[in-house]
Amino acid sequence: MTLTMEAIYSKDLNAVLQYNANMANPNGNFTGPDSRPRYTSSGARSVDGSVREAMVLSNTKKGGSFSYSAILTKGFTKGFYGQLSYSFNYALDVSGNPGSQAASAWSNLASYRGNNNLLDPSVSQFSIPHRITAVVSKRFEYLNKSMATTISLFYEGSATGRYSHTYSNDMNNDGVTNDLLYIPATRQEAAIFFPNTAAGIADADIFWSYIEQDSYLKKRKGGYAEQYGGLFPWVHNIDMRFLQDFSVRTGNTKHTLQLSVDVLNFTNMLNRNWGNRNRLVYGNGRILRWVSNTGAGVPQFAVNTVSGQKPIKTFETSPTVSSTWGMQVGLRYFF
């Protein structure tokens, strides 16, 4: 049995960063609990109104990562093999470059500062903090080793990605639809952000219930959601492999016909509620849309609908092949 451990620390020295040189500093602020910067008009956000964007490719030293892994391995003993591994990762960056061009990589960043040029390091969209894998395999030989059966199980457990809680439209007039959510500290504070109408009061109740059922938002009450602060739930997945060998020897040559059966997401085959991946009920977690500001400058919102329904939970099962089991059958000949 062997144990292997590894730790890696890295520091960004010249990480890629884009910024819009035509972006002016915000010229106002909202009032109330969410007093983030804003632009009072669309014209106020540009240094030169005749130019839409002036993207500059730059570098930043802000950011870094730490990772740790441990692997415990049990070598082949009487046909048995086993391995257990754990990995931890924490990474910060200013930009993970979430776009195909400089402009989209810049505009796809989420912020509450009112200007995507003014960003601090946040958790990387690629940073999955914990991951566990395991392999167990056993080979059985019989009939004078003319036949053999191998059964293997492969386990993986981890979160499946990160996301940001943002509004579904441009609340601060910066021209970018990626403003991070403010999470009210109390139910009474939440009411400030919705019109004092029957629909507004109902939306405030829905929003507060949504916060209470979301483990991340509950911890951020009275503050802003973080860029890629949301983490998708863990998925526990087991794959199974079955190998059946049929061997004969002619002279000095051994001929083996091997039948293989691979069951992907074997957990889901056992129970349709197991091995399921999750997706956000409303696209990218954008459950609120900005509708107006009060005369005093307090932003007002409405809860978005999903297929005519108001969202009451963060996640739902993703109806894709990744949430279902599959089978592969193969036949190989060795000589």
Please report, for each region that a protein language model flagged, where it lies by residue.
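Hydrophobic, lipid-facing positions within transmembrane beta-strands of outer-membrane proteins
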Residues: 1, 66-70, 130-136, 236-242, ...
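Outer-membrane beta-barrel and related beta-rich outer-membrane complex signature
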Residues: 4, 15-25, 94-102, 161-179, ...
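Gram-negative outer-membrane beta-barrel transporters
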Residues: 4-146, 151-160
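Intrinsically disordered, low-complexity regions of eukaryotic proteins
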Residues: 8, 14, 36, 50, ...
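Extended hydrophobic/aromatic segments used for targeting, binding, or gating
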Residues: 23-32, 38, 47-50, 99, ...
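C-terminal substrate/ligand-recognition segments
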Residues: 77-82, 225-249, 253-259, 263-270, ...
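Extracytoplasmic gating/loop element in the C-terminal half of outer-membrane beta-barrel translocons
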Residues: 150-251, 258, 283-316
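CBM-like carbohydrate-recognition segments
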Residues: 319
